[in-house]
From Swiss-Prot:
Cross-referenced Gene3D superfamilies: Fe,Mn superoxide dismutase (SOD) domain, Iron/manganese superoxide dismutase, C-terminal domain
Record flagged with keyword Transferase: no
The organism of origin for this protein: Staphylococcus aureus (strain NCTC 8325 / PS 47)
Pfam families cross-referenced by the UniProt entry: Sod_Fe_C, Sod_Fe_N
Subunit text: Homodimer. Can also form a heterodimer with SodM.
Residues annotated to bind Mn(2+): 27, 81, 161, 165
Name assigned to this protein: Superoxide dismutase [Mn] 1
Keywords, comma-separated and alphabetical: Manganese, Metal-binding, Oxidoreductase, Stress response
Residue runs in coiled coils: none
Gene name tied to this protein: sodA
InterPro entries: Mn/Fe_SOD, Mn/Fe_SOD_BS, Mn/Fe_SOD_C, Mn/Fe_SOD_N, Mn/Fe_SOD_N_sf, SOD_C_sf
Induction per the UniProt record: Transcriptionally induced by internally generated superoxide stress in a manganese-dependent way. The presence of manganese increases SodA homodimer activity and simultaneously decreases SodM homodimer activity. This occurs primarily due to post-transcriptional effects, since the expression of the gene is independent of manganese availability in the absence of superoxide generating compounds.
Cofactor(s) essential for the protein: Mn(2+)
UniProt function note: Destroys superoxide anion radicals which are normally produced within the cells and which are toxic to biological systems. May play a role in maintaining cell viability throughout all stages of growth, but may be the major SOD activity in the exponential growth-phase. Has a role in resisting external superoxide stress. Involved in acid tolerance and the acid-adaptive response. Mediates the derepression of perR regulon in the response to HOCl stress when the level of SOD activity is low.
Cofactor info, note text: Binds 1 Mn(2+) ion per subunit.
Length: 199
């Protein structure tokens, strides 16, 4: 197998009560696992098997046309979720260089959270909300489906899955409540690590 489902860096119930155990189990073991299985099927026998998922997603135009859609959807799904799990933590602490940079750009962490939440809530249908580094500056963007900002040359350092499968069992159609809960489990240490790696 070229690509594998990563283990969660915490227990399924570690993010309770914000992200519930049942959703985490289904999201990781079924949804993410399906992306990995379909991605492996799509790239089997191609030179993509030896490339990193980041390299593939950043260079989607070079993926053969007959498998490009499958790789975009499932490769994006694998990359996005692999990053998402690492960006969550039961020990969320708002500190680091990136937090200072956010305050510098948005005026306050609360203003940043408001803009991020507004854009995440406004993302029509399925997709993701991201904090990215673009030419040295922070920027909030959203992507449809399983698209990743790397495809546009932007480096994601924080991401939130706003597909219904990420929150429907607990929050039903109340996406803003799910987005609000997200701030309680952000792994700012990982966000800071990703931000500093772009310098």
């Amino acid at each position: 197998m070229a690509f594998e489902l990563p283990k969660l860096p915490y227990a399924f119930d570690a993010l309770e009560p914000h992200f519930d155990k049942e959703t985490m189990e289904i999201h990781h073991d079924r949804h993410h696992n399906t992306y990995v299985t379909k991605l492996n099927a799509a790239v089997e026998g191609t030179d993509l098997e030896s490339k990193s998922i980041e390299e593939i997603v950043a260079n989607l135009d070079s993926v053969p046309a007959n498998i490009q859609t499958a790789v975009r959807n499932n490769g994006g799904g694998h990359l996005n979720h692999s990053l998402f799990w690492e960006l969550l933590s039961p020990n969320s602490e708002e500190k680091g260089t990136v937090v200072e940079k956010i305050k510098e750009q948005w005026g306050s962490l609360e203003e940043f959270k408001k803009e991020f939440a507004d854009k995440a809530a406004a993302r029509f249908g399925s997709g993701w909300a991201w904090l990215v580094v673009n030419n040295g500056q922070l920027e909030i963007v959203t992507t449809p489906n399983q698209d990743n900002p790397l495809t546009e040359g932007k480096t994601p350092i924080l991401g939130l899955d706003v597909w219904e499968h990420a929150y429907y069992l607990k929050y039903q159609n109340k996406r803003p409540d799910y987005i609000g809960a997200f701030w309680n489990v952000v792994n700012w240490e990982k966000v800071d690590e990703l931000y500093n790696a772009t310098k």
